[in-house]
Amino acid sequence: MSSDIQDPMAQLVPMVVEQTSKGERSYDIYSRLLKERVIFCCGQVEDHMANLIVAQLLFLESDNPDKDIYLYINSPGGVVTAGMAIYDTMRFIKPDVSTVCMGQAASMGAFLLAGGAQGKRYCLPNSRVMIHQPLGGFQGQASDFEIHAKQILDLKERLNRMLAENTGQDYEKVARDTDRDHFLSAEESIDYGLVDGILRQRGEES
């Protein structure tokens, strides 16, 4: 059973009011944080989210190509092609993109976390990271199924090689670990090479 009625609190976005020389100016909280070069990747990774994040990355590069960008991730993962659009843009632009996991970074969320600038990838203390192989579902003729199966296997190998490069792990180890859901704590994520440190308090890294 479904309903068109939505919880109004689910769409409530806090507003921030600032005093300027021309009077008060209000921003939604995400626009205000964007001024501080903070971007959020929260929820399912899909095309609409990816387009918004890519646009913000490109805007911040044009605003200042020499200043770091901070991508905060709390995501269960999602569509691989949408995630790759974000990943490729992170690598394409001039500013370093520092990634921070808050809550969880699973599947494509973990891939984006590890894809941040080396030395600038972090977890919060109680966050969780999960890596696994890409999931595929297809219905159709047998010949089409074979085509899609080959595509998924090729994608799996490519993602594993990129993850191995970003973590410093052997490809064979990454392939074994991603064969099933592989969960890591913040500390284990450091050992694996997914992140470079744990942010416990502002200005304090371990």
From Swiss-Prot:
Belongs to the peptidase S14 family. It catalyses: Hydrolysis of proteins to small peptides in the presence of ATP and magnesium. alpha-casein is the usual test substrate. In the absence of ATP, only oligopeptides shorter than five residues are hydrolyzed (such as succinyl-Leu-Tyr-|-NHMec, and Leu-Tyr-Leu-|-Tyr-Trp, in which cleavage of the -Tyr-|-Leu- and -Tyr-|-Trp bonds also occurs). Fourteen ClpP subunits assemble into 2 heptameric rings which stack back to back to give a disk-like structure with a central cavity, resembling the structure of eukaryotic proteasomes. CDD domains: S14_ClpP_2 (cd07017). It is found in: Cytoplasm. GO terms for cellular component: cytoplasm; endopeptidase Clp complex. One of its GO terms (molecular function) is ATPase binding. Keywords: Cytoplasm, Hydrolase, Protease, Serine protease. This is ATP-dependent Clp protease proteolytic subunit. InterPro entries: ClpP, ClpP/crotonase-like_dom_sf, ClpP/TepA, ClpP_His_AS, ClpP_Ser_AS. Cleaves peptides in various proteins in a process that requires ATP hydrolysis. Has a chymotrypsin-like activity. Plays a major role in the degradation of misfolded proteins. GO terms for biological process: protein quality control for misfolded or incompletely synthesized proteins. It is an enzyme of class 3 (hydrolase). The active site is at S107, H132. Signal peptide: none annotated. PROSITE patterns: CLP_PROTEASE_HIS, CLP_PROTEASE_SER. It comes from the Bacteria. Its EC number is 3.4.21.92. It comes from Idiomarina loihiensis (strain ATCC BAA-735 / DSM 15497 / L2-TR).
